[in-house]
């Protein structure tokens, strides 16, 4: 009878131990996920080739937008002309992407798509300008002198840029700066 009580006690304590370990692991996973503030909704579907990385803790983006390095990005899955893209971004209180540096879109580095960005040629200033009127830094696109001034710029997150007719249809990236 004593052997039976000891075996039963070991069985019960072993089962309770496994339950405690499972609950601890689940709690750890839930806590880790609650501190990650990557705001992306399943309905967004930026495409199978976009790989998201952790967001910094300084931003919260609206539904269907991706938060990364204190900015919010909308990565379209539909194709529009450059002007249509610009107007759609403006309607969301944002602008077509203005790149600050070549690392800005690291979270999309596996994408092969080209997207309209907010860079176009100003005949008035005879220069490539961002939507906000600032000049293009030469280090971003070293070969920008070869771009056709009658075109707009489509950008690939791998760092490639193409000049294409502004009437062509491409996907686009809107950017909202939070800070």
From Swiss-Prot:
Chain ranges passing through the membrane: 11-31
Organism domain of life: Eukaryota
Paired cysteines (S-S): 58-70, 61-72, 89-174, 152-166
Keywords in alphabetical order: Adaptive immunity, Cell membrane, Disulfide bond, Glycoprotein, Immunity, Innate immunity, Lectin, Membrane, Receptor, Signal-anchor, Transmembrane, Transmembrane helix
Zinc-finger in keyword set: no
Database matches in Pfam families: Lectin_C
Protein name in UniProt: Natural killer cells antigen CD94
Gene behind this protein: KLRD1
């Amino acid at each position: 009878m004593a052997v039976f009580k000891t075996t039963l006690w070991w069985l019960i304590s072993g089962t309770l131990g496994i339950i405690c370990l499972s609950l601890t692991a689940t709690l750890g996973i839930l806590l880790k996920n609650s501190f990650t503030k990557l705001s992306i909704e399943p309905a967004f579907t930026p495409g199978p080739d976009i790989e998201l990385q952790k967001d910094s803790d300084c931003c919260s983006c609206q539904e269907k937008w991706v938060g990364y390095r204190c900015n919010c990005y909308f990565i379209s899955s539909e194709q529009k002309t450059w002007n249509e893209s610009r107007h759609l971004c403006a309607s969301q209180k944002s602008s077509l992407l203005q790149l600050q540096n070549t690392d800005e879109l690291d979270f999309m580095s596996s994408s092969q798509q080209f997207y309209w960005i907010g860079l176009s040629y100003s005949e008035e200033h005879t220069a490539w300008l961002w939507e906000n009127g600032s000049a293009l830094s030469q280090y971003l696109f070293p070969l920008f002198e070869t771009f056709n001034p009658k075109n707009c710029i489509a950008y690939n997150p791998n760092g490639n840029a193409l000049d294409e007719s502004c009437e062509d249809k491409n996907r686009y990236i809107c950017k909202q700066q939070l800070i």
